[in-house]
Structures are given as C-alpha cells and as structure tokens.
C-alpha cells in the first residue's frame, strides 16, 4: 500500500511538472526588448522617404509604402488573415469619394494576422493609418510622425508577437494588424473596414489605435516620457485598467489623460481610426503624443522623430495588446460611450 502510494505521488509530481512546462509564459518582458529604436528608425526612413511621395490615398507612392509593409510581414513570416486572399482589403473609389468627393482613386487597407492558440475567433485589432497628404505645390509631405510613426510601430509589434509565437508563447487570441488608408480624408479606411469587416465586429474585443507617437508637444517640453491615452475608459473599465496595469508593469510612461476629456475642444477622440470601432461598441484606446509645429507640414520629417520615445510608446502598445490577447476574459463593455 505504501509502495503504491509512493509511486502514485511520483507520477502525480511528474505530471504536474509536465503541465507546468507546457503552460504559455504570460510575461512579455523578453519580447518587449525586440522592439527597438534602431529598427523603428530603419523602417521609418523608408516609409517617410521622398520615394513614397507623401503617401496620398491611392497614389503610386502610397502603393509603394504598402509594398514595403507587405515585404516586412513576409520577411517576419506574418501572413495575411485567414479568409483573405492576400494582404489587401481593396476599397473602390466610389466609396472613398462618396462623402467629400476628393477625386481619390481606388486604394487599399493593408492587413496581416497572427492566429490565436486558444481563442482564435476572438480578435484584437491594432490599427494605424499609412496614408498622408501627398505632394503640395511641389513639396513632398512625408508625414514621418503622422502617421509614419504608428505605421512602423505596427511592424515592430507584429515582429515581437511572431517571435513569441515561434518560441511557443503565441497569443491566445488572434491579432489583426490593420494599416488603414484614407484617414486624412475622413477616416475612410477604418470606416470601410467597420462596414466590411473580415471578422465579425461582435468577435472583435478591442482596437488599439496608434496615430502620431514620435514627437513631444508644447505641454511636455521637459520630457518625452509620456503618451496621451484617449478613450480607454469610454466603453470599458476593463480596458482602462489593462492599459494602466500594462504600463506600470512593463514600460512606466506617464499616461496623460488631458485629451480624454469629452469637453476638450480638439475632439481628438473623434479624429482617428479607433472611432470607427468605438462607435460600433468595441472598446478602443488611442495612443498619441500630441500635435507640434510640423503637423501637416512638409517639415514633418524623420530627423525630428524622438526614437527613444517612439520605442517606449510602441512597447506600451505591445504590452496592452499582449494583455488583451492573453487574459482569461475579453474586456467587458460596461459603459455607453456617450
């Protein structure tokens, strides 16, 4: 009897040890380190180069930028989404010109995808717009911060998640990396996606939107160790808490809620692509470092980007996505958003 009990205890111990070794490591610390200022700079010098001709919606320059994004996803073995035939969500000119008639040609959202290991049908969206305002009076508006910074952040976040996946620590939920077009003409790419989603909006648990995170504004001349968070608590207390906790555990930026005030006259909450998710009841957070003297000017160039700050803000977006993708429950919608 004693011998039988002894053998049972040994077997149970071995079983527990085996189970522990197969548990996914929920700590993203080692993958945070793969997001670097150096890599962000390398990507941004391409995305915000004169060759891209200011990335006007539907232009040949924007299509070159899209080609570069796709080449990087392929290099990192991040595929296009299940259910899609390639990396493009094609948007007809008829949709892009329906409201403002800016005479835009056909354009595309660019998407990439990492499938979740346990809840693949639940989707975390990470979005950034890759269009800018093109060439004006012979000057190329390269939009290094707006939104080259968010565009390259998505590439680095995808690379970090893919590295984790290859090491057996892939996300439990699926992640859609969504580079939207037409933001500068009225959030058109995200509007098209929200009306023609590849995955049901009911299965989309959150959107993390990244738009202009590469500089500092007049309110933070003494330090760039901050980021504005907008909208995290509008629909979901859970999302607000996730953002706060992820920052405290891993990044330690100053989270500034100045523009989270619904009475703020700038109305930034309504001016970037997360809004097309939020208005459909999807918890959303907008990461932003504020406006500066080069906003929508030809002087928004790569040499003015603060890459150490861009690195930390990108790392924060990654950790928020990590928490959303791996926590037990999706964030509860417990507020109206109004």
Residue ranges with predicted function:
Residues 27, 288-338:
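His/Asp/Glu-rich mid-to-C-terminal helical/loop segments that flank catalytic regions of hydrolases
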Residues 55-114:
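A non-catalytic alpha/beta surface segment that caps or lines the substrate-entry region
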Residues 180-284, 332:
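Metal-dependent peptidase/peptidase-like ectodomains
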């Amino acid at each position: 009897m004693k011998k039988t009990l002894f053998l049972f205890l040994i077997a149970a111990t071995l079983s527990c040890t085996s189970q522990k070794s197969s548990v996914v490591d929920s700590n993203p610390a080692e993958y945070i380190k793969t997001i670097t200022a150096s890599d962000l700079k390398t990507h941004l010098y391409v995305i915000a180069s004169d060759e891209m001709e200011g990335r006007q919606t539907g232009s040949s320059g924007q299509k070159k930028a899209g080609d570069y994004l796709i080449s990087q996803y392929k290099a990192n073995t991040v595929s296009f989404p299940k259910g899609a035939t390639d990396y493009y969500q094609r948007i007809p000119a008829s949709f892009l010109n329906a409201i403002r008639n800016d005479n835009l040609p056909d354009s595309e959202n660019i998407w990439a995808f990492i499938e979740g290991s346990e809840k693949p049908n639940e989707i975390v969206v990470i979005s950034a717009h890759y269009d800018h305002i093109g060439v004006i009076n012979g000057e190329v508006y390269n939009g290094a911060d707006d939104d080259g910074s968010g565009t390259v952040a998505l590439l680095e976040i995808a690379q970090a998640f893919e590295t984790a996946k290859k090491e057996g620590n892939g996300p439990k939920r699926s992640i859609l990396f969504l580079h939207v077009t037409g933001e500068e003409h009225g959030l058109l790419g995200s509007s098209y996606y929200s009306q023609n989603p590849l995955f049901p909006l009911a299965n989309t648990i959150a959107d993390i939107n990244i738009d202009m995170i590469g500089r500092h504004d007049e309110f933070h001349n003494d330090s760039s160790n901050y980021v504005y968070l907008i909208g995290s608590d509008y629909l979901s207390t859970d999302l607000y808490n996730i953002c706060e906790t992820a920052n405290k555990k891993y990044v330690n930026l100053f989270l500034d809620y100045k523009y989270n005030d619904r009475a703020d006259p700038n109305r930034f909450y309504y001016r970037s692509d997360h809004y097309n998710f939020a208005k459909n009841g999807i918890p959303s957070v907008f990461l932003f470092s504020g406006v500066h003297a080069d906003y929508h000017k030809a002087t928004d160039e790569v040499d003015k980007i603060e890459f150490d700050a861009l690195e930390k803000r990108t790392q924060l977006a990654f950790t928020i996505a990590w928490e959303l993708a791996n926590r037990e429950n999706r964030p509860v919608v417990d507020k109206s958003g109004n």
